[in-house]
Regions:
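Short, small-residue-biased leader/transition segments that mark boundaries at the very start
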Residues: 3-8
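Central hydrophobic cores of alpha-helical transmembrane segments
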Residues: 10-16, 65-72
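Juxtamembrane "helix-exit" motif on the non-cytosolic side of transmembrane helices
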Residues: 20-31
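Short, charged/polar, Gly/Pro-enriched secondary-structure boundary elements
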Residues: 30-31, 215-222, 448-452
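Cytosolic-side transmembrane helix boundary signature
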Residues: 34-68
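Extracytoplasmic/lumenal acceptor-recognition loop(s) of multi-pass membrane glycoenzymes
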Residues: 71-92, 106-177, 217, 223-242, ...
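A cross-kingdom signal targeting lumenal/periplasmic-facing segments of multi-pass membrane
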Residues: 142-278, 282-285, 296, 312, ...
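Active-site-proximal, structured, solvent-exposed surfaces of multi-pass membrane proteins
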Residues: 262-492
Length: 492
């Protein structure tokens, strides 16, 4: 019939439309797409269109087609889940440190009732803060703020720029910015540097220890308004952190670039890496299974050395040399800042990049290595600590405290910007804005102030009004029905 023919045409055109969309989409591949996912999507499109066309033909049994539809749904879910879920550890490993971490966390809670963040020096899973029950910075959630995730990535955190970022021992500047007060480490995981952390608790069986940040800042503090010029662009995370510190305090040079004393290639050739930045290299054939790049760096002053490595092809890096007892290794597929420990001026650290797994004949690596100027950092920290919020009360949706400010300043927080957050200074609502495209910030004048931060989910008032109206409407309808029945019974 003409109607059936129209249905067939619509289904064919819709199927062709989706097929065209997939073909166009594969021209703009993202990190979440692959050639296999494109082919599987096309295959499912063809199968779904075929099933829908079969449903229009009377010759096919509806029960058989219904079973086929259910089977298709399950197949699609199985294919999707199997390709996206990666099991990295067994159940026993998953919970092996639970008792140790819980003892340490309970010791912290007993010692300190203030508002702060705690972290592990090595996270076994993205959601360790939820699993172990502590207030951390790490998260992996569909509700995470993408701008905040991007900022964390730009600051040198392990993450995906979208909805996940994971803490690894960071610089004192980062720990100060993001309210990190305690770190917990097991004997097999990295120990925080004693230059900035003090051990305050050790489990009875020595299964874990707690370290307190000597340069802790509360959730909010006053900083110079020059921060309006802060550009938190992706690239060199030390520049992003250093610019924040400079603009917030007026002190420059908290990070000092390391010197580069040597660059050598084994079974590769490439640029000479002589300073922080990006350098290119290549191998004679993509079939070559061996090749290394070795860069030697040397701090220009005493202090902790931090390094950040990124490459689209290199997966692992190793660090050895003066002051490093055992060779350190790092997976740089997802780059993040690594603390190489305290080193004296002139010591040499060898950075070895394994290029054996390169699938291309040419690639590049970005390397940024810095040491800390402890004197500059200490001065800047004291400036910010003197104008930090003294938290007096806090809960799930509010933080209250007092602050003393010397000059017109920004009231900076490590809270993700959300229009649901309201800031009240001395009872008056202040205008909030984004800092670094992600952080909740407002302005504050000189003097002593009472500050209150309140959170109300966006749309709560409208949602409550709509729900209340609906409830009232249903109640009114039921009352009218009840009255009408009464009248009918009386009339009868």
């Amino acid at each position: 019939s003409s109607a059936a023919s129209d249905v067939y045409k619509r289904q064919v055109f819709v199927g062709l439309g989706w097929l065209l969309y997939v073909i166009v989409a594969q021209k703009f591949m993202t990190t979440k797409m692959s050639e296999i996912s494109i082919y599987v999507t096309i295959a499912f499109l063809i199968l779904w269109c075929g099933l829908l066309l079969c449903l229009q033909k009377s010759g096919f049994k509806k029960s058989v087609l219904a079973f086929a539809v259910i089977a298709m749904c399950f197949s699609e879910v199985i294919v999707s889940d199997c390709s996206s879920i990666l099991i990295t550890q067994g159940n026993s490993d998953y919970k092996s440190n639970y008792a140790a971490y819980r003892e340490s966390i309970e010791a912290i809670n007993k010692k300190d009732s203030d508002f702060y963040r705690t972290e592990l020096t090595y996270l076994e899973r993205r959601m360790d803060p939820s699993y172990y029950g502590y207030n951390g910075i790490s998260t992996f959630s569909s509700m995470a703020y993408e701008d905040y995730s991007q900022l964390q990535y730009n600051l040198g955190m392990f993450g995906n720029r979208i909805n996940s970022y994971t803490y690894n021992p960071q610089t004192p500047v980062y720990n100060m910015m993001f309210n990190i007060k305690y770190l917990i480490a097991t004997p097999t995981n990295p120990t925080p540097t004693d230059r900035y952390f003090t051990e305050v608790y050790r489990n009875k069986d020595k299964s874990a220890a707690v370290y307190e940040n000597d340069c802790f800042l509360p959730i909010a503090y006053a900083a110079k308004t020059h921060l309006k010029d802060w550009a938190a662009d992706e690239g060199d995370p030390f520049k992003v952190q250093g610019d924040y510190f400079r603009l917030a305090t007026g002190l420059d040079g908290v990070f000092v670039p390391c010197g580069y004393t040597d660059c050598s290639y084994d079974n590769l050739s490439g640029d000479t890496c002589s300073e922080n930045g990006t350098f290119w290299f290549n191998k004679s054939s993509s079939d070559e299974q061996y090749g290394t790049v070795e860069v030697t760096i040397s701090p220009l002053r005493d202090g902790n050395v931090y390094i950040y490595l990124a490459s689209p092809e290199i997966k692992t890096a190793e660090f050895s040399g003066d002051g490093i007892k055992n060779t350190l290794s790092q997976n740089i597929e997802e780059p993040y800042i690594m603390d190489l420990g305290y080193h004296k001026k002139g010591e040499e650290i060898k950075v070895s990049l394994d290029a054996g797994s390169m699938s291309a004949t040419e690639s590049y690596a970005s390397i940024y290595a810095y040491s800390m100027d402890e004197t500059v950092f200490a001065k800047g920290y004291r400036l910010l600590a003197d104008s930090a919020l003294q938290v007096t009360d806090w809960g799930e949706a509010h933080i209250t405290g007092t602050i003393t400010v010397r000059e017109n300043s920004y009231l900076c927080t490590s809270i993700p910007y959300d229009t649901g957050w309201s800031v009240y200074i001395d009872g008056k609502k202040a205008e909030t804005f984004k800092l670094g495209e992600a952080l909740l910030t407002t302005t504050v004048k000189p003097g002593k102030h009472k500050v209150e931060l309140r959170y109300t989910p966006k749309g709560l008032a409208i949602g409550a009004a709509v729900s209340g109206t609906c409830v009232a409407g249903v109640a009114g309808y039921l009352i009218l029905v009840h009255i009408r029945r009464k009248k009918q019974q009386s009339a009868g």
